[in-house]
């Protein structure tokens, strides 16, 4: 039997996934300081940016200095606050070849409606790197320029229900994590995954669950059922009001809409939520359910 031996490979060894691109580099010594910090999570498309922006305005209406940080490559978190898609931190860093010392605050911080300060962290190109690096660099830049010293509240608006170490990076800085959810199975299933991620992060960081924001839902029976089993509580409820959808289309927050009963109703709920968060939200010791248990709990009989 003739045996042909394959010649040894002479090509360079395979590079690790994401090599040469932006990678997560979290510095445990970089902390935000005295500001109250909230991270907003939820299923993709559930209305986190709309919720975050209106909450930021509500907090500013109560006299607080607010900074909203968008943590999504779409960089549209602060769209209704600034009325445009502002450049991201990653875009600005690339322009100076990642020499952060060359940046000025006005290069990456933009003032939005009612004085809310806005930053879009952005993210690496699709399929490469880790968004956690950008979050870490954003917080580092803000601290280096002493911008966090003049801030009372920081809102992180985080990409979808991605709970990898990178996009869970805001949890390193947050006091409380808020989950936006609708009254449907997919949204609650995603919420359960987020609960698991927060539980994991809480072993090393002070972040705790602050509650559920029910959104785009006339009823909350399914959310209530999950909350009871998991140990959560709904802290605000925004029904599927058409004025909320229209505000996004008009590039504005609810606090800029023409007065109407529905607008006033939504505004008052945001102001109530903002006041309760400032007063202090007791941490919730939620326990995530197993996937099978969620199907049994919320599935068809």
From Swiss-Prot:
Tagged with keyword Magnesium: yes
Keyword Heme: no
Pathway noted in the entry: Porphyrin-containing compound metabolism; bacteriochlorophyll biosynthesis (light-independent)
Low complexity compositional bias, start-end: 1-13
Matching SUPFAM superfamilies: P-loop containing nucleoside triphosphate hydrolases
Region (Disordered): 1-21
Record-level GO BP terms: light-independent bacteriochlorophyll biosynthetic process; photosynthesis, dark reaction
Cofactor: [4Fe-4S] cluster
PROSITE patterns for the chain: NIFH_FRXC_1 (PS00746), NIFH_FRXC_2 (PS00692), NIFH_FRXC_3 (PS51026)
Cited CDD domains: Bchl-like
E.C. no: 1.3.7.7
Residues annotated to bind [4Fe-4S] cluster: 130, 164
Record-listed ATP binding positions: 45-50, 74, 215-216, 239-241
InterPro entries: NifH/chlL_CS, NifH/frxC, P-loop_NTPase, Protochlorophyllide_ATP-bd
One GO MF term attached to the UniProt entry: oxidoreductase activity, acting on the CH-CH group of donors, iron-sulfur protein as acceptor
Cofactor binding: number and manner: Binds 1 [4Fe-4S] cluster per dimer.
Reactions it catalyzes: chlorophyllide a + oxidized 2[4Fe-4S]-[ferredoxin] + 2 ADP + 2 phosphate = protochlorophyllide a + reduced 2[4Fe-4S]-[ferredoxin] + 2 ATP + 2 H2O
Binding site for Mg(2+): 49
HAMAP family in the record: ChlL_BchL
Subunit structure: Homodimer. Protochlorophyllide reductase is composed of three subunits; BchL, BchN and BchB.
Family to which this protein belongs: Belongs to the NifH/BchL/ChlL family.
NCBIfam families: DPOR_bchL
Biological role: Component of the dark-operative protochlorophyllide reductase (DPOR) that uses Mg-ATP and reduced ferredoxin to reduce ring D of protochlorophyllide (Pchlide) to form chlorophyllide a (Chlide). This reaction is light-independent. The L component serves as a unique electron donor to the NB-component of the complex, and binds Mg-ATP.
Protein name per UniProt: Light-independent protochlorophyllide reductase iron-sulfur ATP-binding protein
Name of the coding gene: bchL
């Amino acid at each position: 039997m003739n045996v042909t031996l394959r010649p040894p490979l002479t090509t360079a060894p395979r590079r690790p996934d994401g090599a040469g691109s932006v990678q997560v580099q979290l510095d445990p010594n970089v902390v935000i300081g005295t500001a109250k910090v909230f991270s907003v999570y939820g299923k993709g498309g559930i209305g986190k940016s709309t919720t975050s922006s209106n909450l930021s305005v509500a907090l500013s209406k109560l006299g607080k200095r607010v900074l909203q940080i968008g943590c999504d490559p779409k960089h549209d978190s602060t769209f209704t606050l600034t009325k445009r898609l502002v450049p991201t931190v990653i875009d600005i860093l690339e322009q100076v070849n990642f020499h952060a010392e060359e940046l000025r605050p006005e290069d990456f911080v933009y003032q939005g409606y009612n004085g809310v300060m806005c930053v879009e962290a952005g993210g690496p190109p699709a399929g490469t790197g880790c968004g956690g690096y950008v979050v870490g660099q954003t917080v580092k830049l803000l601290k280096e320029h002493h911008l966090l010293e003049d801030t009372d509240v920081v809102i992180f608006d985080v990409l979808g229900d991605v709970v990898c170490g990178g996009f869970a990076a805001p949890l390193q800085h947050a006091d409380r994590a808020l989950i936006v959810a609708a009254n449907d199975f997919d949204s609650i299933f995603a919420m359960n995954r987020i609960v698991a991620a927060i539980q994991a992060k809480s072993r090393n960081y002070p972040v705790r669950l602050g509650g559920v924001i029910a959104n785009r839902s006339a009823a909350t029976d399914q959310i209530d059922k999950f909350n009871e089993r998991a140990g959560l509580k709904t802290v605000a409820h925004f029904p599927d009001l058409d004025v909320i959808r229209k505000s996004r289309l008009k590039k504005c927050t609810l606090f800029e809409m023409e007065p109407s009963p529905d607008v006033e109703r939504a505004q008052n709920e945001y102001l109530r939520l903002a006041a309760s968060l400032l007063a202090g939200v007791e941490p919730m010791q939620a326990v995530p359910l197993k996937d099978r248990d969620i199907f049994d709990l919320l599935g068809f009989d």
